[in-house]
Amino acid sequence: MTTDIIPVMSMSKIYTNKQKLTQVICAIVWCLLGSGVIFGFASIKPILIKEGIYSSLCSPEDDLPFGKACDNQDLKLNKLFSYGAAMTNLTSLIVGSLLDSYGPKFCGYIGCCLITLGSIILSYNQPLYQYFDSYIVGYVTLAVGGPFVFISCFQLANTFPKYSGTILALISGAFDT
């Protein structure tokens, strides 16, 4: 009895350099637009003040011009950023473990879902604010989603080993921008 040997095809795909470059560019844009949005707080804080976020914390005696925050409002807004920044760093530990166990695709999906959820919470903060502090919850949800997106993109530095340092620098720069 003879047995024919059937060649086993590799499950890994071979990508062209154009496809690899497209993937790296998309990851950089993804990190730029989604992963580090909480670090633009200095730019958004004046807008939050003008929108009257946490203005209920100000007393009527605070005679401030429009666009200026009272001390309590300013402290609460700073607390918002502090919670977000702390959660970004704490989440990095969790992301590393999940990345090792489930891979970058899984972590990318989680990051996408968290960033979407945080955006929805912040978009509908007026009706939600009566039940919980939707600004902090939405902002922290954005902050937690960022590292899932950012760290899952690191593996793309291996697509072009000769330029791995440059790719990592671009991804890191996109996160902090």
What are the functions of these language-model segments?
Residues 32, 79-86, 140, 169-177:
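Transmembrane alpha-helical cores of Major Facilitator Superfamily
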